[in-house]
Amino acid sequence: VLGQMVLLLLPACAAGLITGFLLSSVHIQLVAGGGFLVTLALGSVNLLRTWNQAGQPGSAATDHLMIALCLLLIMTCIGMAVGINVLWTPPVMPYGTLHLVAYTHTAFLGFFLQATVAGLSYALPALLAAQRVTSHKKRVAYQDTLAQIANRWRALQVSTLSFGTLGLVLVASLTWNLPLSSNWIQAGTWGSLGLLL
């Protein structure tokens, strides 16, 4: 029941956020963002509960999915804080448009990358096994072997993708004080992209 409620509320809250953005109404954005935050928290609790009750060991896909959910929760909290900041006159934390764009896009990039890698880690072994092996009995064994290969370095996969995303957040925060042509920003950008690869 909780899972169905989450699946119904997430699109409704996302539609509310989009409506708030289109109407440039911070109040609508905050209400929809609050609903989105509560729905995400309920979805995370439901996912963790289902995962624990299933008794299955974790995999790279589940690790990436949990980090993607954490990034989405953090991004929603930051978005609500920015909305509350905008309502105050003068704003408690003055920031430029470039900084706001950098933070929101970096958080979204982290969520998108983690969710994409989670989907690939889950679906790729099954797709490759279905394409390469015609016998059903051999396909299951081949798929298990591919899943083991995908999970072999799962801690390294998750950590490099996470640190690459955090590195981009650091680069975004460095733009407050340094020009874009700075060696620090260029080194941070290339180092983060190297971790993401």
Give each language-model segment a name.
Residues 1-197:
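Hydrophobic alpha-helical transmembrane segments of multi-pass integral membrane proteins
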